[in-house]
């Protein structure tokens, strides 16, 4: 494709600078087309690797799971959006041993406290408490961190942003008392019992019963993670599961660029197994920040 575009441009009198730009612009669709063709070829040569799973009626107490949404609280309106989003995910995944939490920071700032911070935090706490009154007392949580001074960035911000929130939350689940989560709303007594976390972005939807299905996969004996004491990493089984992530029809139609890179959109109820090139070839994939992981 690139060679054809270059030859066409040269025949029609394009100069070298313009020819270079044409080649560069052609590389984007050409690379995407090449990737799609290679993945389709591999999917025909190697069948999708389907992981064994348990057909669970509900999440067992020994596999208590919490869905976490790391995010930024920058307004009261944003708090309302997040609370509504969390409630929708919970209604699609009803289970007494499945919980939902917001892990939040304030936006980066040049000062430690901004006007309106207290109002936002009060609204967030009230929203989580209202959800617990409406549904169950141990269903929803809020874990919020105040800003810390970052010498390198020259800003007041949440420590290590998203990665820091998740890392500190894992420590909090294992009884750490020195995290920067200064505001904790919800029934904290269940935290030591949490075995798995499902991390989502604030714009990610969790399909109906998807959490239970993920737990059914990770708890299957053949999938349980084995950590090599010498290497200090998982050498057998899986410590992280990442389900297929697809783009909604509305998001894919947002622009030509989105249409090009969104791939298969929506949810296909008739698909039983989906090919992933890395998983099918190597038995492992690339984690993009959305999925289930074993806390331990």
Spans of model-derived segments:
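Membrane-water interface at transmembrane helix exits
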Residues: 9-10, 38-43, 215
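Internal catalytic domains of large membrane-associated glycosyltransferases
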Residues: 51-296
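Transmembrane alpha-helices and immediately adjacent membrane-cytoplasm interface residues
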Residues: 22-47
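Transmembrane helix-loop junctions in multipass membrane proteins, especially transporters and channels
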Residues: 10-15, 43-51
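Hydrophobic alpha-helical transmembrane segments
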Residues: 7-29
């Amino acid at each position: 494709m690139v060679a054809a575009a270059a030859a066409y441009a040269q025949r029609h009198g394009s100069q070298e600078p313009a020819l270079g730009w044409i080649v560069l612009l052609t590389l984007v669709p050409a690379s995407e087309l090449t990737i799609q063709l290679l993945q389709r070829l591999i999917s025909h040569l190697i069948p999708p690797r389907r992981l064994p799973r348990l057909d669970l009626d509900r999440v067992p107490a020994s596999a208590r799971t919490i869905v976490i949404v790391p995010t930024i609280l920058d307004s009261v309106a944003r708090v309302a959006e997040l609370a509504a989003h969390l409630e929708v995910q919970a209604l699609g995944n009803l289970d007494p041993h499945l919980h939902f939490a917001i892990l939040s920071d304030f936006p980066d700032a040049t000062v430690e406290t901004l006007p309106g911070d207290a109002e936002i935090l009060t609204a967030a706490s009230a929203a989580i408490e209202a959800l617990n009154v409406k549904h169950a007392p141990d269903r929803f949580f809020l874990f919020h961190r105040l800003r810390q001074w970052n010498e390198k960035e020259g800003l007041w911000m949440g420590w290590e942003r998203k990665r820091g929130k998740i890392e500190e939350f894992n420590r909090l689940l294992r009884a750490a008392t020195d995290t920067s989560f200064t505001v904790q709303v919800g029934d904290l007594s269940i935290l030591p019992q949490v075995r798995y976390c499902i991390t989502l972005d604030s714009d990610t939807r969790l399909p109906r019963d998807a959490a239970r299905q993920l737990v059914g996969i990770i708890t299957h004996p053949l999938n349980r993670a084995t950590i090599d004491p010498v290497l200090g990493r998982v050498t057998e089984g899986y410590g992280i599961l990442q389900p297929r992530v697809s783009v909604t029809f509305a998001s894919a139609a947002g622009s030509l660029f989105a249409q090009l890179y969104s791939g298969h959109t929506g949810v296909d109820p008739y698909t039983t197994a989906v090919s992933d090139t890395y998983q099918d070839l190597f038995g492992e994939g690339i984690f993009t920040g959305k999925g289930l992981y074993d806390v331990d």
